[in-house]
Amino acid sequence: MLMKNRIVKFVVLVCCLCSMPGIVRAQLSVHQFDQLMKKIDDVLWYEKVGDIAHVDKVILCGPPRWKESNPTSMSAGNELKFRAYIFIPKSVKENKKYPLIVFPHSGVHADMDTYYAHIIRELIAQEYIVVAADYRGSTGYGAGTYNNIDYGGLENEDVYISRNYMVDNFDIVDGSRVGIMGWSHGGMITLMNLFNYPGQYKCGFAGVPVSDVIMRMGYASDSYRKIFSAKNHIGQTAKDNIAEYKRRSPVWPAETLKDPLLIYTNTSDDDVNVVEVESMIRALKAEGKKFEYKIFERAPGAHSFDRLDTYESSKIRLDIYKFMGRYLKPNKPFGSVKELRKAAYKF
């Protein structure tokens, strides 16, 4: 019934959009359009993974804004609400426990969407339970959530809260087998969660992770830098407040790592420069930390090299799952690329 209701809403949304005069469509704000696209993509989750997973979306509370624009307003100091997706394999038994994957999405001002459907299918097939938070700053929920961005800050705690929600509220989740994995900005959040909450995760994978925000400001575009210096965010440039940008960079708290970690990067990455990730690797080595990493040489796909639908990308992901599986012990680990691809693409 829930699936049918979502399909009906989807059809209504598309019909309404198509029937609007061009001038009206043009007047839709960016946030209104993002909200519309989010609702459509939410329906697609049921189409893409609903055959093997129970799909749900919950509302959680994270800490208050790190900086209030109006300290005397009625909402000042209130916890911030955010959404989180939950994917549970349909094969689970209520009297058993299963490992949990915490999956922070990639992108600045982005959201968890069906770009990752094939990877969610791969995780579900191994009988992982997955939680994926649309943490503060995510798109698809209006200007309020968007403007609450806290890059490298309390967004990390939002993701950690989603972890705790699953452990505390689902008896089928094994709290001793919780892993975290993500790419790009999600890789950065993976690192920060491992560094900020040592011992709370059994292991982690960080793919092409943003690692040094100060360095990043040196090669990023002006539009990217303005996201950070905007009044609703840091409100200052890195030149004006180096300490604040340092606080948001995983490269600095590397000494706190206690849990198994795997890092992947690519020399042809056109988003997170390999030099930035190399700085993270060097910092961990300098602290004498035991971890694993691999620097791929001009792998096809650049920033997305190990998230593609190609056979080669599937091979790389199989190695990632083998690493995670060492510590999380899923019930149905993949034995081959063929098994992985059948899980992701059905054939």
Regions found by a protein language model. Give the residues of each.
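N-terminal targeting or regulatory segments adjacent to alpha/beta-hydrolase or S9 domains
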Residues: 1-5, 9-61, 342-347
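Membrane-interface helix-loop junctions at the exits of transmembrane helices
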Residues: 21, 134-135
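N-terminal cap/lid segment of alpha/beta-hydrolase-fold proteins
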Residues: 36-96
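Active-site-proximal cap/loop segments of hydrolase catalytic domains
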Residues: 60-70, 135-347
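Short beta-strand element of the alpha/beta-hydrolase
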Residues: 95-107
